[in-house]
Amino acid sequence: RPLSEIDAAASALIGQLAAVKPAAANELETLRHRYLTRQLESMRARVSMLSGAKLTFDEESQALYDAVAPVHRESEFQATLDELNTLLPGKGSLIDRYDAFRNAFQIPSDRLGRVFDLAIAECRSRTLQHATLPSGESFTVEYVRNKSWSGYNWYQGIYRSLIQVNVDLAINIDRAIDLACHEGYPGHHVYNALLEKNLMRDRGWVEVSVYALFSPQSLIAEGTANYGIEVAFSEQERLAFERSVLFPAAGLDAARVEEYYRIQKAVDRLSYAGNEAARRYLNGEIDRSAAAAWLTRFAMMSPKRAEQRTRFMDDYRSYVINYNLGKDLVKQYIEARCGTDGNAHERWSEFIALLASPRLPSDLKQ
């Protein structure tokens, strides 16, 4: 279908929606009305881009994802890099020392399936303690190569997903729980299954049967998938499970669990460096090799992983903000409703309610 026709159809639908006034007392219908309008607006923006329109990184993320990531300067990452320099003493560059450290925590390829199965089972068990999932829900896992992403959930409908894990690069032990939660329970698989059950099947909202990737829905999806890791596991619960189950299953030294996650916790604070590389690269301020070098220097990505990430930027552009900004917005939204010290049941309840509702990123801002 020609792009001009898609744009005209989306514009007409926005006009029709503007003529409909949902009952103010019906919060869900009000959310649905705003959600549909904003999804259609993002479709028009995407069509405009495919037709040749040039947007800055921030203009694009606002148009497509209803959000703009904060700007961070090099100096803001330096304190964390200095901390890592102390935590990882020795000769050579910091990235070389970090890579050497991480190499000791890779999951051997012949143990990968077993480790992921254990992580998935635990994530599912924890999710089922707090969420009622549709009968028959399930997913299968495939291991693939030659992708720009590390993991992907292909939702098949009827409460089933295909989850693909990219094995181009070695997979470290922390990725087992991260991917099991993010792609599966309580992340993308649960998100899509609950939308299908609660909104499409129970309420007849046919629009839920279509997932527009380059839309505000993706910030909610990626944000909840990343925050879902913290919902499923407190820091101490995760360390205990890694120590007693996953490290032994991977043949790794369980006595080093705390050491490993102390380093990873510091590295995680550098996540917004990835946004800055993407912003500068996609704005034309730096080239691809400079973006990869930035990722290596400020986001602590190995050269191979940085190169993979720049391929992701080529494919998905400002989508990168959905992971870290999305997580932060979801975290702020839920903690504003149940507090930072709220009990696990309260947090799960707010989290599941968010998964099963048509909220926009702008709805999450308190």
Residues of each region from the PLM?
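N-terminal maturation segment of proteins
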Residues: 1-366
